[in-house]
A protein has these predicted regions:
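Accessory nucleic acid-recognition modules appended to NTPase machines
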Residues: 1-163
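Short conserved micro-motifs at the rims of enzyme active sites and ligand-binding pockets
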Residues: 107-110, 167, 177-178, 213-215
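Cofactor-binding loop segments of dinucleotide-utilizing enzymes, especially the Rossmann-like FAD-
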Residues: 147, 205-206
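Active-site ExK catalytic segment of metal-dependent nucleases
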Residues: 162-174
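Active-site-adjacent loop/helix micro-motif of nuclease/hydrolase catalytic cores
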Residues: 172-183
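Arginine/glycine-rich "motif VI" loop of SF2 helicases in the C-terminal RecA-like domain
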Residues: 183-197
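Short, hydrophobic beta-strand segments that form beta-sheet elements in well-ordered domains
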Residues: 196-205
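Domain-level recognition of nuclease-like catalytic cores that cleave nucleotide substrates
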Residues: 206-226
Length: 226
């Protein structure tokens, strides 16, 4: 019953896109929307235009993607280093579905799989979608921090000119190095993060609430507390 209802909702979204998209962009908006499962099924969360269609470019799909974002059909997460540069934002982009349940349907996985604690690309995608959904509801603007191929903090949340860094781990044995790398960069002069505005760091985990020297551990289910 629930999967059927979720699929009906996804079909309605697709129908709305076809009907309401600006003239001449409906096909591109549909293709962008339909590429979301493919975007989520890879290790890197960075949006790849070639997964929309062969030969697809940011120039062609920038306007359709922006329309999906502005109409609340997807949740964007930009590279913090891009600032207000719209062109760069469209290149260094993470894109999430607006609902965790719809995400499971898009990826064709049963909801109970999320409770197994299994490390998988699908579980990671659904976890990040859940967190993005919670943070948006709490009024944060989403971005992420990256130091090239060395480290990435998936969520750098901003509100009232302050930033909060959030990483997560699905299983207790996963190592947490990204927050510490970000912390260490705070003491470097050449930084890729607005360090003077970095207020707090959190690790979302299966563990209970706990304080570490440089960050706070919060259970994943309590992401709304941040």
């Amino acid at each position: 019953m629930v999967p059927d209802t979720q699929q009906k909702l996804l079909d309605l979204f697709l129908n709305d896109i076809s009907t309401l998209a600006p003239k001449g962009t409906a096909r591109y908006c549909r293709n962008s929307w339909l590429s979301i499962p493919s975007q989520l099924e890879k290790t890197s969360r960075k949006f790849q235009y070639t997964r929309i269609a062969k030969g697809a470019t940011a120039k062609t799909y920038q306007e359709p993607l922006q329309w999906l974002i502005q109409n609340g059909l997807v949740l964007p997460c930009h590279d913090n280093r891009d600032g207000e540069n719209t062109a760069r934002q469209q290149i260094n982009l993470h894109l999430y579905p607006i609902d965790t349940g719809l995400c499971t349907r898009m990826l064709k996985i049963p909801a109970y799989q999320l409770l197994t604690g299994e490390e998988s690309i699908a579980n990671t995608a659904c976890t990040e979608t859940f967190l993005a959904q919670q943070f948006i509801q709490n009024g944060y603007t989403l971005s992420y921090w990256s130091s090239g191929n060395q480290a990435e903090v998936p969520f750098l949340l901003s509100k009232n000119n302050h930033f909060i860094a959030v990483d997560y781990r699905i299983t207790p044995h996963q190592k947490c190095r990204n927050l510490m790398r970000l912390y260490n960069i705070r003491h470097q002069t050449d930084s890729s993060c607005p360090l003077e505005q970095l207020k707090q760091m959190y690790l979302l985990s299966t563990e209970d609430f706990k304080s570490k020297e440089h960050y706070q551990i919060v259970p994943v289910y309590a992401a709304f507390c941040i």
